[in-house]
Amino acid sequence: MLGFQQRLLLEEQEKFIDYRFNKALVRRLTLLEGAELEKFMQLFRPSYLFTKLSGDYEFRLYIKQSLYRYKRGLPPLVWEEENLLDQ
């Protein structure tokens, strides 16, 4: 069972991801709507670390590359968190 402080931290991290990876931005970049938009956002939700460390260009590029994979039925890429820290 997670401690109260850990739960609060996880909640804040999820809110930060929601703030950057929001429906308005994803809809604008992908032109997806409705259930398809929801499915895409669930499948390709970025990690907290990637969301925190990436700039706007990298973040939008991630969404576009994810759309390419989504439309071809490919799974999301697995990001190696250690590589993000080395940059």
Regions found by a protein language model. Give the residues of each.
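Short beta-strand and adjacent turn/loop elements
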Residues: 1-87
